[in-house]
């Protein structure tokens, strides 16, 4: 059974979530890496989080949001969660359609998965294509519980803030595109929305939320015109 791991990176102005899958039965972790100088014991803070195992699905659901979110109007079509999920799933469709149009033949293979407690994702892979050696375009919707120490470390909060386990919601899309042509750069992007609920022992506390993301390309051979084009679009 596949498990889910997530890595969070912080900077003075950002808080970034990267998600991956691994075929192991080991615990799920959040790993925090701090770019600025901090005391060694806190440089790499690894904490277990409550994330359920994935279940393969035969078809895509209308939404990966929890039904119980409706009690808090979180699953309504106007909520940020629902709007962001719709946006990343639309983006996945458009990116895959554009890649397949260039390929003129090879198609993406799709895996859909969910979790009993809510959340899930769609993974699409194309490999050995005419243009792309391998292309992956994924979306995921995740629910979990963040230890208070992890939240404080990520947000540089004081020890008095956010007591108790912190329920969280995260949704995002990510992609890595490797072309066959070595003179063409590898492209990567990821965009996500992260939200924490009130701590379990402090009901009614304010919800925290933020967006993050970025796009980059990694050339094996640098061409100045490629760099200029990338930064102009």
From Swiss-Prot:
This protein's UniProt keywords: Chlorophyll biosynthesis, Chloroplast, Heme biosynthesis, Oxidoreductase, Plastid, Porphyrin biosynthesis, Transit peptide
Catalytic activity as recorded in UniProt: coproporphyrinogen III + O2 + 2 H(+) = protoporphyrinogen IX + 2 CO2 + 2 H2O
EC number: 1.3.3.3
Pathway membership, UniProt: Porphyrin-containing compound metabolism; protoporphyrin-IX biosynthesis; protoporphyrinogen-IX from coproporphyrinogen-III (O2 route): step 1/1; Porphyrin-containing compound metabolism; chlorophyll biosynthesis
Gene Ontology molecular functions: coproporphyrinogen oxidase activity
Function, as annotated: Key enzyme in heme biosynthesis. Catalyzes the oxidative decarboxylation of propionic acid side chains of rings A and B of coproporphyrinogen III.
Protein family according to the UniProt entry: Belongs to the aerobic coproporphyrinogen-III oxidase family.
UniProt-recorded name of the protein: Coproporphyrinogen-III oxidase 2, chloroplastic
């Amino acid at each position: 059974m596949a498990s889910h791991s997530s890595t969070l990176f912080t900077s003075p102005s950002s808080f970034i979530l990267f998600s991956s899958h691994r075929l192991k039965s080991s615990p799920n972790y959040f790993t925090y890496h701090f770019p600025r100088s901090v005391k060694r014991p806190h440089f790499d803070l690894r904490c277990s989080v409550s994330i359920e195992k994935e279940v393969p699905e035969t078809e895509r659901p209308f939404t990966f949001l929890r039904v119980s979110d409706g009690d808090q109007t979180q699953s309504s079509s106007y909520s940020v969660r629902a709007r962001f999920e719709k946006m990343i799933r639309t983006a996945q469709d458009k990116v895959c359609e554009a890649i397949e149009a260039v390929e003129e033949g090879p198609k993406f293979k799709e895996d859909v998965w969910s979790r009993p407690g809510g959340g899930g994702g769609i993974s699409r892979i194309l490999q050995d294509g005419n243009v792309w050696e391998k292309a992956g375009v994924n979306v995921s919707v995740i629910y979990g519980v963040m230890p208070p120490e992890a939240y404080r470390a990520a947000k540089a909060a004081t020890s008095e803030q956010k007591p108790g386990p912190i329920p969280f919601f995260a949704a995002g899309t990510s992609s890595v595109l490797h072309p066959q042509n070595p003179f063409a750069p590898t492209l990567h992007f990821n965009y996500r929305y992260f939200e924490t609920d009130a701590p379990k022992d402090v009901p009614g506390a304010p919800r925290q939320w933020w967006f993050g993301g970025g796009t980059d390309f990694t050339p094996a051979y640098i061409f100045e015109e490629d760099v200029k084009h990338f930064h102009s679009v």
